[in-house]
From Swiss-Prot:
PANTHER family: ACETYL-COENZYME A CARBOXYLASE CARBOXYL TRANSFERASE SUBUNIT ALPHA, ACETYL-COENZYME A CARBOXYLASE CARBOXYL TRANSFERASE SUBUNIT ALPHA, CHLOROPLASTIC. Residues 38-292 form the CoA carboxyltransferase C-terminal domain. One of its GO terms (molecular function) is ATP binding. This is Acetyl-coenzyme A carboxylase carboxyl transferase subunit alpha. Component of the acetyl coenzyme A carboxylase (ACC) complex. First, biotin carboxylase catalyzes the carboxylation of biotin on its carrier protein (BCCP) and then the CO(2) group is transferred by the carboxyltransferase to acetyl-CoA to form malonyl-CoA. Its main location: cytoplasm. One of its GO terms (biological process) is malonyl-CoA biosynthetic process. It is found in: Cytoplasm. GO terms for cellular component: acetyl-CoA carboxylase complex. The keyword Nucleotide-binding applies. It is an enzyme of class 2 (transferase).
Amino acid sequence: MNYLEFEKPLSEIEGKAEELRALARGNKEMDVEKEAAALDRKAEALLKDLYKDLTPWRKCQVARHPDRPHCKDYIEGLFTEYMPLAGDRNFADDHAIMGGLARFNDNPVVVIGQEKGHDTKTRIERNFGMARPEGYRKAIRLMDLAHRFRLPVVTLVDTPGAYPGKGAEERGQAEAIARATQKCLELGVPLVTVVIGEGGSGGAVALATANRIAMLEHSVYSVISPEGCASILWKDAEKMREAAEALRLTAQDLHKLGVIDRIIKEPLGGAQRGRRETVEAVGKAIEMMLKELVGRKPDWLIKDRRNKFLDMGSKGLAA
């Protein structure tokens, strides 16, 4: 288990309990279960206290936790007959975005998501979830297929933002993001999104201009990272806590503002402490969102999606 900075007291208690049990495994005559159980109760109480009222900055830390389920985990856990598509038919295949045809509850869908990777090798391969233009163009290809075959689209968002490198800019990063956002708005099929970790800037919006948007309880969704915001506004990245407060990037704030439609509860201690339960909860949320939309006419779906985003400026964010 990887512990976050604010979880250090918890790591000490759980570490002691594990040490006691390890000693008992090496010496059958030792009876440490009573002491270990007491430490377990203490750890659970502390965990509840730590997660009772997380600050926006702490939610950012939880959203970035390396042990949270990632896009690949959700696809493997919720979808069957997954057939990935590769490449943008123009430049290359971007591994930061994965997607393809699949079945969800036995019904055909198109699933698209950003994948960060779980270890050093896969994180480098996936570019830490930061897509290049070819990734967004691959997403457009998939959405075109969904539109042609009348398949609902499910997107899973988890990115710190689109890749800001020189090559990406030269190949039209801004244009690719804009085209992907435009494609979302034009789709005549149901489009639902779940923010499973970080939803960073236009790199997230390009996959999240949806009819229905859900966020995991401790995920975040913002125009910029707290560190980036602090660097621009205060010329000091260390002011990320103040920036996180000001950005109103938590699921709870965004639900109040009308930016998202649903909050998916996470297990105590975050998705990383209950990966299977989290995947199942996301599956139920996707099922409920699709039920609201499947069977609707294309014109209705397009109008619903457009009005959702147009209304943000007059009803939610402007309030």
